[in-house]
Amino acid sequence: MTQYFRSLAFFLLPVPATAMACDGWPSWARGACQRVDQIWNEGGNDLYLTGYSWHNRAMYSSDKIRSFNELAWGGGLGKSIYDEDGDWQGLYAMAFLDSHSDIEPIAGYGFQKIGRIGADTRLGIGYTVFLTSRSDIMSRVPFPGILPLVSAGYRDATLYATYIPGGKGNGNVLFMFGRWEF
């Protein structure tokens, strides 16, 4: 459990530092810095709940499927905004049980183009860029990633899904989680 808290602290400690002034940043990175600063300082608070990961049955043996944990329980916190174009942008930090029932911390940035279906309903498509750590990949050394991200939302609740690609016997996982704006 101590390892879990160390991993989570690794991801959470840099987050408040993003609220610094962006003037000293190179011009090519200043826009990203300013957006992160805006999300951190002006964004609403989010509660994330994880709960399901589906392993593609065509890529694993039935014995291997039975060994996997597909109830990826966990949660986290984040901050997000709907920008001047109506698109969603957010920062998040979560921890959940991975396929081997080990705790996986993750922290990152998400972006989605949002299509509105009425006043309260929306669909989104975009991506997430993140840093994570897994016991079965590089012995918990944090590593970056980028994944597609789709969503369906109603009022303050949004359901997200991403697909982790892979080969025969690894990856190929549909991961679903939710976000509640408060």
Curated annotation (Swiss-Prot):
Q: Which reaction is this enzyme known to catalyze?
A: a lipid A + a 1,2-diacyl-sn-glycero-3-phosphocholine = a hepta-acyl lipid A + a 2-acyl-sn-glycero-3-phosphocholine; a lipid IVA + a 1,2-diacyl-sn-glycero-3-phosphocholine = a lipid IVB + a 2-acyl-sn-glycero-3-phosphocholine; a lipid IIA + a 1,2-diacyl-sn-glycero-3-phosphocholine = a lipid IIB + a 2-acyl-sn-glycero-3-phosphocholine
Signal peptide range in chain numbering: 1-21
UniProt xrefs under InterPro entries: LipidA_acyl_PagP, OMP/PagP_b-brl
Superkingdom is Bacteria
EC class? transferase
Active site positions, chain numbering: 55, 98, 99
Q: Which Pfam families match?
A: PagP
Q: Name one GO molecular function term.
A: O-palmitoyltransferase activity
List the Gene3D superfamilies: 2.40.160.20
Q: Which UniProt keywords apply?
A: Acyltransferase, Cell outer membrane, Lipoprotein, Membrane, Palmitate, Signal, Transferase
Q: Where is this site: Role in lipopolysaccharide recognition?
A: 64
N-palmitoyl cysteine lipidation sites on this chain?
Answer: 22
> Where does it reside?
Cell outer membrane
Lipid-carrying residues in chain (S-diacylglycerol cysteine): 22
- GO aspect biological process, one term: lipid A biosynthetic process
Q: Give the E.C. number(s).
A: 2.3.1.251
Q: Sorted alphabetically, which PROSITE patterns does this protein's record hold?
A: PROKAR_LIPOPROTEIN (PS51257)
**Cited HAMAP family:** PagP_transferase
Main role? Transfers a fatty acid residue from the sn-1 position of a phospholipid to the N-linked hydroxyfatty acid chain on the proximal unit of lipid A or its precursors.
Protein family (similarity comment) = Belongs to the lipid A palmitoyltransferase family.
Under which name does UniProt file this protein? Lipid A acyltransferase PagP
The organism named in the record is Bordetella pertussis (strain Tohama I / ATCC BAA-589 / NCTC 13251)
